[in-house]
């Protein structure tokens, strides 16, 4: 917000002022929210090519990107973009990487070192939502060995000070989440989670966590209110000692922090590797709910949770609606339609453009900052 006392009473400046006010009123404001990234999924048959996608990230000033596998077309397009990348090692490769260092070295050479430093890889996410209580249980015994091998290979490549190795988990691993201070990993999964926590603690890497208040709400609307899920509850919903919770996102996040502490990982940070809200396809999945959740999530990421105040590095799921995903609601998480038209009104950063879901505009966030 400009502190200048100068007044410019020309018609042109009046029009600019009016435009800026309208943009401030209508946009999901991410000005200064450097902790926000967006996940780039590719499960659609009508998506833009990689170069167009990365140009879209750049033109919207989206400075962080999650990539679910080392797609070389996307990595080529990312060269020189200055976008920070969370690079996924897919579940299908975990067992192979765990089986020997030679495989980890090859993977790091082909997918990391060959693109470094032109591509700013920040994290390697080894596996996504591998868990002993889901359909990925067959991979659980291979996950930590795969993480260790990739970590060693990254170190051998001379990138140990630049790239952190972790894994992305979901909330199925949390056995107790209420109240948040009593959060703990499932007793029947501790054999799986404890080695992961120890690895992250020892390597000073964060745990990557996919947090979706939508699924908690839609699965139990009688107990979890929509306002609590959308960051719009007018009053405190959960009083946990001295900590007050007005939204489900914070409660979920802090329950994982508590679980980490109970597992010897008090020093382990958290990156929210996915969060979003579908705009169609199931109960509670509406355009208005999705817009409200995204607006408030983006704002809240600047602030932190009751347990851990401060910016929360958060990746919105996802960049596009992806028509090859199932079930139906999974097709409707995108910030953009496949034709690159925005679904919502969002402003990514002080140097990026404000964009409108009905009409594209060349107005910049610096213009808005003059109001």
Swiss-Prot record:
List the induction conditions.
By ethylene.
Keyword annotations: Glycoprotein, Glycosidase, Hydrolase, Plant defense, Pyrrolidone carboxylic acid, Signal, Vacuole
Signal sequence, renumbered to the chain:
1-33
Q: What PROSITE patterns does the database record attribute to this sequence?
A: GLYCOSYL_HYDROL_F17
| EC number, UniProt record | 3.2.1.39
Q: Which Pfam families match?
A: Glyco_hydro_17
Phosphoprotein keyword on record: no
**GO BP annotations, alphabetical order:** carbohydrate metabolic process; defense response
Q: Which InterPro entries match?
A: Glyco_hydro_17 (IPR000490), Glyco_hydro_17_plant (IPR044965), Glycoside_hydrolase_SF (IPR017853)
Catalytic reaction equation(s): Hydrolysis of (1->3)-beta-D-glucosidic linkages in (1->3)-beta-D-glucans
Q: Name one GO cellular component term.
A: vacuole
Kindly list the GO molecular function terms attached to this UniProt entry: glucan endo-1,3-beta-D-glucosidase activity
Its annotated compartments are:
Vacuole
Is-annotated flag, keyword Hydrolase?
yes
The record's similarity note reads: Belongs to the glycosyl hydrolase 17 family.
Give the propeptide positions: 350-371
Q: What is this protein called?
A: Glucan endo-1,3-beta-glucosidase, basic vacuolar isoform
Q: Which function does this protein serve?
A: Implicated in the defense of plants against pathogens.
Tissue specificity field: Is expressed primarily in epidermal cell of healthy plant, and following induction by ethylene, accumulates in mesophyll cells.
Where Pyrrolidone carboxylic acid occurs, the residues are 34
Q: Which residues form the active site?
A: 129, 274
What highest taxon heads this organism's lineage? Eukaryota
Q: Which residues are glycosylated?
A: 362
């Amino acid at each position: 917000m400009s502190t200048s006392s100068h007044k410019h009473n020309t018609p042109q400046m009046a029009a600019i002022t009016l435009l800026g006010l309208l943009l401030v009123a209508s946009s999901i404001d991410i000005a200064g929210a450097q902790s926000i990234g967006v996940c780039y999924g590719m499960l659609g048959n009508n998506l833009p090519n990689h170069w167009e996608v990365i140009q879209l990230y750049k033109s919207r000033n989206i400075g962080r990107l999650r990539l679910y596998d080392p797609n070389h077309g996307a990595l080529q397009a990312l060269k020189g973009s200055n976008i920070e990348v969370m690079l996924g090692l897919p579940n299908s490769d975990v067992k192979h990487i765990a089986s020997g260092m030679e495989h980890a070295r090859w993977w790091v050479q082909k997918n990391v070192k060959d693109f470094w430093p032109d591509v700013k890889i920040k994290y390697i996410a080894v596996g996504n939502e591998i868990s002993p209580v889901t359909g990925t249980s067959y991979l659980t015994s291979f996950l930590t060995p795969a993480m260790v091998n990739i970590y060693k290979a990254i170190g051998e490549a001379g990138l140990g000070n630049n790239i952190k190795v972790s894994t992305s988990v979901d909330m199925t691993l949390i056995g107790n989440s209420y109240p948040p201070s009593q959060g703990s990993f499932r007793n029947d999964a501790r054999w799986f989670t404890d080695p992961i926590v120890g690895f992250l603690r020892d390597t000073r890497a964060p745990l990557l966590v996919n947090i979706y208040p939508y699924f908690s709400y839609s699965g139990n609307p009688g107990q979890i209110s929509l306002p609590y899920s959308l960051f719009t509850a007018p009053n405190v919903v959960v009083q946990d000692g001295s900590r007050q919770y007005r939204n489900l996102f914070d409660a979920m996040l802090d329950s994982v922090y508590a679980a980490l502490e109970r597992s010897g990982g008090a020093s382990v940070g958290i990156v929210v590797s996915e969060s979003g809200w579908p705009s169609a396809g199931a109960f509670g999945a509406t355009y208005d709910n999705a817009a409200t959740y995204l607006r408030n999530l983006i704002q809240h990421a600047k602030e932190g949770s009751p347990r851990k105040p401060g910016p929360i590095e958060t990746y919105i799921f996802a960049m596009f609606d992806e028509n090859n995903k199932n079930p139906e609601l999974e097709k409707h998480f995108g910030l953009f339609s496949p034709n690159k038209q925005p679904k919502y009104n969002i402003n990514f950063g002080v140097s990026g453009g404000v964009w409108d879901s009905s009409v594209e505009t060349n107005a910049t966030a610096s213009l808005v900052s003059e109001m």
